[in-house]
From Swiss-Prot:
GO biological process: translation
PROSITE patterns from the UniProt entry: RIBOSOMAL_L23
One Pfam match: Ribosomal_L23
Family matches, as SUPFAM superfamilies: Ribosomal proteins S24e, L23 and L15e (SSF54189)
Function per UniProt: One of the early assembly proteins it binds 23S rRNA. One of the proteins that surrounds the polypeptide exit tunnel on the outside of the ribosome. Forms the main docking site for trigger factor binding to the ribosome.
An example molecular function term from Gene Ontology annotations: rRNA binding
Name this polypeptide is given: Large ribosomal subunit protein uL23
Signal peptide: none
NCBIfam families, per database record: PRK05738.2-4 (NF004363), PRK05738.3-4 (NF004368)
Organism: Synechocystis sp. (strain ATCC 27184 / PCC 6803 / Kazusa)
Any Gene Ontology CC annotation: cytosolic large ribosomal subunit
Assembly and oligomerization: Part of the 50S ribosomal subunit. Contacts protein L29, and trigger factor when it is bound to the ribosome.
Family listed: Belongs to the universal ribosomal protein uL23 family.
Keyword Ribosomal protein recorded: yes
Gene for this chain: rplW
Length: 101
């Protein structure tokens, strides 16, 4: 039994791409890192990336990043917990994160 996934919901699953030194080094292996919503599943993330960027995804690895303490004035709080997805693309496919550069 297959589940029909709404295209608008798929677009909302991807929060932002991660552009750190470690994530940039993974671009050489055709791997892209994204912050995704915590309730997103691997098949949904795969469908969202394929729909938004018109590429073929060969693998998705996910990890829940821990909450971090954040000081706001004299009060201590927490930054929200996020889920991070490392998406591996088919050889030859690529995502243009910075179209003007």
């Amino acid at each position: 039994m297959s589940k029909v996934i709404d295209q608008r919901r798929l677009a909302d699953l991807i929060i932002k791409p991660i552009v750190t030194e470690k994530a940039t080094l993974q671009l050489e292996d055709n791997k892209y890192v994204f912050d995704v919503r915590p309730e997103a599943t691997k098949p949904e993330i795969k469908a969202a990336i394929e729909l938004l960027f018109d590429v073929k995804v060969t693998g998705v690895n996910t990890a829940r990043m821990p909450r971090r303490k954040k000081r706001v004035g004299r009060f201590m709080g927490f930054k929200a917990q996020v889920k991070r997805a490392v998406v591996t693309l088919k050889e030859g496919d690529s995502i243009q994160l910075f179209p003007d550069v």
